[in-house]
Design a protein with these regions (language model features):
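Active-site-adjacent structural elements in enzyme catalytic cores
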Residues: 2-420
Length: 420
């Protein structure tokens, strides 16, 4: 019998607790919505899933692919297991976790009620990239999962491998993104290993995540309206198509720090980009430590950030944005910075050929799905290039563009360059 491909990905001990992180390479599996076929199909894949599920049952942590990003899973009922997730990520304990289930019937054992509007959204978008915040059933989940709140975010992923793992584990799986806190979320198993090898029990490699951004998080109010706490793979327009016009509201946008009123070498971002270039896990935790626990992940802290300083450039036209960004990048290069530019393909010709040391495209503005799918990998590309000063073009904040801009603004810590 063919053994599952298990290289027992040996790494130097870094956490003091896990000397090696197990690694399984599985057959690719595509999301298929409600008609998702059973998985795994091969004996090798089935054995790998069972071994990973056994780790979860034993209280260990396993990274696995979903249609959004790779998640770091643990038994949501076990405080010790959930503590291991927080420790591996360096995640602040007041940041709640999303619970993943494989069957809708499992909701009955986790929450006290499901509002009819929430049920309508679940019917429309599960399995899929939608997390619904619901009143938690006391005493079932570890209190660390909910960060002491009386609600819990639950979703059913649209990925055969993820569903197979949850079913095999036989428990609700708490799973934030499988990266160090504050870093870009992982869309490949290689990203997980880059951040967490030696900190976690295992990684199931199922190929690239399809959506590329985390799930949309919504909370239905008593009047039936839905508040979007975090934009994601399901757009506000899609939610409104189910609940009706005017029934969807958004949480407040991240605070904005306008770094450049008029673009040029004299701006703060150009003068001292290195001030924010060093990544520190604690830096993402510093802001807002005394504020209440967020109702959903991604609401309180800096997230998704590359190691270099990042600013988002916006303006009245693509030409103005390109001119402002080019001026700032040239000034940064003269100051000795390694520069990066994140742009959309339609605007590439507006920049000089040597606009930055590392230029990465998010594809076409006409295909926001492509931009969403490649955003986190693009931010990691800048790290690979050693970029210390990065500028990213803004995009329209409609449809999926709202989620892209949410992630960019979080990654930039709210720093905006206003090109006028």
């Amino acid at each position: 019998m063919k053994k599952p491909q298990d290289s027992s990905f040996a790494v130097q001990r870094r956490s003091g607790h896990i000397e090696s992180t197990r690694y399984w390479k599985l057959s690719p599996a595509e999301p298929m919505g409600a008609d998702c076929a059973p998985y795994p199909q091969s004996t090798a894949d089935r054995e790998a899933i069972e071994e990973a599920a056994a780790l979860l049952r034993e209280g260990s942590t396993v990274a696995f692919p979903t249609e959004t990003v790779y998640g770091l899973g643990a038994d949501a009922r076990s405080t010790a297991a959930v503590e291991a997730v927080f420790a591996a990520k360096g995640r602040p304990s007041d940041n709640p976790l999303i619970v993943h289930i494989a069957e809708r019937s499992e909701l009955d054992g986790l929450v006290t009620e499901v509002h009819p509007s929430a049920a309508a959204l679940i019917d429309a978008f599960w399995p899929g990239p939608l997390t619904v915040v619901l009143p938690v059933l006391p005493g079932v989940l570890s209190p660390l999962v909910t960060a002491g709140l009386d609600t819990v975010g639950v979703r059913m992923p649209d990925h055969p491998l993820a569903l197979a793992l949850i079913r095999a584990a036989g428990c609700p799986v708490a799973a934030p993104s499988a990266n160090r806190s504050g870093r870009p979320s992982p869309t490949l198993a290689a990203h997980v290993l880059e951040d967490l090898a030696g900190y976690i029990g295992g990684v199931l490699d199922g190929g690239a995540a399809g959506v590329g951004l985390e799930s949309t998080v919504v909370q239905v109010q008593p009047d039936g309206t839905a508040a979007v706490l975090r934009p994601g793979g399901i757009t506000a327009e899609q939610l409104a198509a189910v609940l009706g016009p005017g029934a969807v509201t958004s949480a407040p946008a991240p605070a904005v720090d306008v770094a450049a009123g008029a673009p040029g070498p004299s701006t703060d971002l150009a003068e001292a980009p290195a001030a924010a270039s060093g990544y520190s896990p604690g830096a993402a935790h510093a802001a807002g430590d005394n504020s209440p626990a967020p109702r959903a992940p991604g609401m309180k802290y800096t997230h998704y950030a590359p190691r270099g300083a990042l600013g988002v450039v916006r303006g009245a036209s693509a030409q103005r944005v390109a001119e402002a960004a080019a001026d700032l990048l040239q000034a940064a290069q003269r100051a000795g910075e390694i520069t990066g530019l994140l742009l959309f393909e339609e605007h590439r010709a507006l920049y000089p050929a040597n606009a930055a040391a590392c230029v990465v495209s998010l594809g076409s503005l006409a295909s926001p799905e492509e931009g969403a799918r490649s955003l986190y990998a693009a931010l990691r590309r800048f790290d690979e290039a050693g970029a210390t000063y990065i500028l990213a073009e803004a995009c329209p904040d409609t449809g999926l563009g709202l989620a892209i801009m949410n992630r960019l603004m979080k990654a930039a810590g709210g720093t905006v360059v206003d090109a006028g």
